[in-house]
Amino acid sequence: MKPREVAFLLVLLFLVAIGFIGAYQMHFQPVMPVEPFESALGYPWRLLVALYVFLVLIGTAAIASAGELLRVRELEHVLKEAILIAIVTIAVGLVTIAVDLERVERGSYALLGHTNATSVMYWMIMFYVLELLFLILEGWFVFRSDLLKQSERKGFKGFVAKIISLKFLGKFFAKQNKDLDMSFARAIGVLALLTAVLAYSNLGALFSATHIPLWNDASNPVYFVITAVISGSAMLIFAIIVTSWVKGEDSGKLEALPILRKVLLFSLLSASLFVLWKSVITGYPAISAEGSYSVQNLLFGKFALNFWFLEIFVGIIAPVLILLFFGKNMDALFVASFLTLVGIFAFRIDFVFSAQVVKKISGVSIPTSVHPFEAMFAVGALALALLLYYVLYKLLPMEVEHEA
C-alpha cells in the first residue's frame, strides 16, 4: 500500500475509534433523558436521527435498480458502485439509529414479544432490513461471475472471492452462468426497488404521523422519495468522479454521468417546488400557529442561515445553475454533487431540529444543542461508512463490467 493510503486508513480508523467511544458512553450514560412534561428541556429526536435519515435516504440502490429494470445501459456500468454504497449507508444508518436508542438490546423484547403491526416505526425498520437483505442478495448475483474469476488468483483477494462466491461449497457454486446470474439480479432488483420506495416513503410517513406541525404533512412520503433520488444521484456522481481521479478514467462508468446529471437536475427542481409549497402551506398563520412558528424559525429565526444558505443556495440554487450551464464539465459536476450532498445534510438537520422548536408555557423556546457524545459518534459513523466502502471496493472485483 502507498503511504497516502496507509495515512488515509489510519485517519479513518482513528475517527471510527472516536465514534466507538461516543457510542460506548451513550450506551451507559443517556445524553438526553426524555421527560414527560411540557416544560421538559431538550429534544427527543436529535443529531443521530438526522444522520440516520441522511444515510438511509441515499437512494443509490433505487436509481441502480430502476436503471437495471429499464435496461439503461449507461447505469448498468455503475450498478456495482450503487449497490455497494447503498449496502454500506443503510447498514451504518441502522447502526446509527440503534445507538440513538441507547439501550437497543431491549428492542428484542418488543420485537419478539410485543410486535405492533400498526406501528409506522416498526414497518420503517422492517422495510430497511428487507431492502438491505435484497441488496446483499442482488449484489451477490451481480458480483458472482467476477468473483469466480477473481477466486482463481492467489493472495488475500482470491481467498475473499472464494468465500463470498461460496465456491468452497462445491461444483454447483463454482459454475459460471453470467446471463442466469444477471436474470436473478434483475428479479431481485425489482424487489429491492419496491422495498426501497416503501422504506423511503414510510420514513416520511413516520414524521407525518406525529402531531408536530412541520412534520404533520401528507406530502412527506413523496418528498422523502424525491430527496432520496437527489442524494443517490449526487452520491453516485461524487463517487464515480473521485474514483476516476484516483484510479484513472473508466469510459464505461463515465458514460453514466450525463444521465445522472439529468436525474439530479430534475429531482432538484422538483424538490424546490416542494420546499416552496411546504413553506407557504405550513407557515401560513391562519392554518396553524405552531406550524407558522416553526417555519418562521427556518425563514427568519435561528435556523435561517442553515435554511437560506446551506439548504437553498448551496443545496439547490448553486447545483442547479452549475448543472444547467456547466454540467458537461466533470469538475463542475463534481462541485455540484458535493454541494448537493452538503445541502441535503443541512436539510436533514434543519428538518429534525427546527420542527421541535416550539414555544413553552413561559413563551420562550429551548435552544438546540448537540451533545459531545453525539458529535463524536456522528463523525465516527461517517468515517465508518467511508472505511467500509473503501475496503470493500479494494477487495471486490469492481472493475470487471458485465454485459447489458
Task: Please place each PLM-identified region on the residue numbering.
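N-terminal signal-anchor module of multipass membrane proteins
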Residues: 1-59, 66, 354-356, 403
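Membrane helical hairpin/interfacial module
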Residues: 43-106, 120-127, 134
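Residues within alpha-helical transmembrane segments of multi-pass membrane proteins, especially transporters
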Residues: 61, 88, 95, 102, ...
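Long, contiguous internal "core" modules enriched in hydrophobic/ aromatic residues
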Residues: 6, 10-24, 72-74, 112, ...
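Hydrophobic alpha-helical transmembrane segments of integral membrane proteins
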Residues: 90-105, 173-181, 346-362
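Short, membrane-exposed interhelical loops at transmembrane-helix boundaries
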Residues: 110-114, 293-299, 357-374
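Juxtamembrane/interface segments at transmembrane-helix termini
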Residues: 24-35, 67-79, 101-105, 110, ...
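Intrinsically disordered cytosolic tails
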Residues: 277, 305-309, 317-336, 341-357, ...
